Every structure is written in C-alpha cells, then in structure tokens.
C-alpha cells in the first residue's frame, strides 16, 4: 500500500465509490527503479495498469513481426497498461521510458481478484480505455504522414509532457535510436530528418538528448497535418 501523499496524487478519471477506491489503494505498488526488462520488454504494461507519477513513457503497438504500427506518449497523470485476463504469448506493446519514470502500479492478479468482489471496477477499466482513445486515433492518422512530420509530431508530444519554466528550452532525453524504435522509421532516415531540422535551427542535438530550440517553427511543420483528434502544439506548457 502506498502512503497518503501518493494516494492524493492519483487521478481516477471517473468518480469511484469509497469502497472500490480503498480496495484499489490497498493493492497499489510504487515503482521507482524499473528494471530494463520491465520497460524494454513491456512486462509492466502487460502485467497490469499503471499511473504515471513522474516522467514520460511511449507505448508502441507492434505486429507479430515486430514492426511498429502505432505509438502514443503518456506523461504525468496518465494511465497505461493491459487489464485483460487473456494470457497470450503474443504481447503487442513495447514501452520506452523517457527520463526518470515513477509509476503507481496495480497488478492484474490483484485487479482480477477485486473484479470478482466489485463489478464497479469494469466502469473504471472502461474509463481508462476512453482516456487514450484520442491519442490512438491521432497516432493512426500520423502513420500516413511522411517521416519528417512523424518525427516532429513525436518530439512535440514529448515536449507537451515535459514540465518547463517560462522561456526554458525543452530538453528531450531521447536518442535517435529510440526515435527509430518508437516511430518505426529506419535509423538512417531518422538521422536525416534530425539533421535537416537542426540545419533549419529548429533543434539542437546533444548526446542522448535533443533541445527543441524553436517550438513555433517545429509546430509549423504540422500545419498541413490533420490533427483533429489531438494537437500537441496546443498542450505545450511554456
């Protein structure tokens, strides 16, 4: 069970009964030092539901041949995971932690046990799926765009989930290899896009991080993109 300060930090998406909330909090686990296997192999995403307390994660949907077909960014205050009891050898998601990540995790073992006691939990499950719907739909639209726009969209989504002081240049702790894995774009093509954007003065490359030096200019790259489900440019806090 987590302490009272962490309990108050959780946003449940919908109003839940005091009984269910208390039972959920009783099985909540704080995850602060995630192993590489938990992140890279997405074990934590397939073994329950997690609330992002700090940091950012990207969730990528893959086909069985490991080709990325969709990706979304989840930041502080967001939920992700798989609460389906169906055990399958095929695990379609992989996740990448951007910077330091802290989670409050609810294991499937505990969630399924609680579901037998209180059907209200399914209302909560439904709210979690609705919470990511717009991101997944926008991600599907982005897959039809060219490489440059897909990379820019990812960078702006990451910026939207980065806490900034007024006037501060966003620093995204991500490598070009990670961008390749997340977007499904070949590493060489990602390098070409990043170099082009740097040449235009829109970003600056450092070791394992990228500074977004011109957010407005990057945003212009998406002017002709259909952002009807989600526009990260409107969500950047700066």
Go through each PLM region and give its residues:
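Cyclic nucleotide-binding regulatory domains
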Residues: 37-99
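Polybasic "coupling" helices that flank or enter modular domains
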Residues: 120-184
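Cyclic-nucleotide recognition modules
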Residues: 71-128, 134
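A residue-level structural signature of the nucleotidyltransferase/glycosyltransferase Rossmann-like core
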Residues: 49, 71, 103-104, 171, ...
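Short loop/turn microsegments at loop-to-beta-strand junctions
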Residues: 28, 46-47, 170, 188
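Cyclic nucleotide-binding regulatory module and flanking cytosolic helices
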Residues: 1-38, 80, 84-86
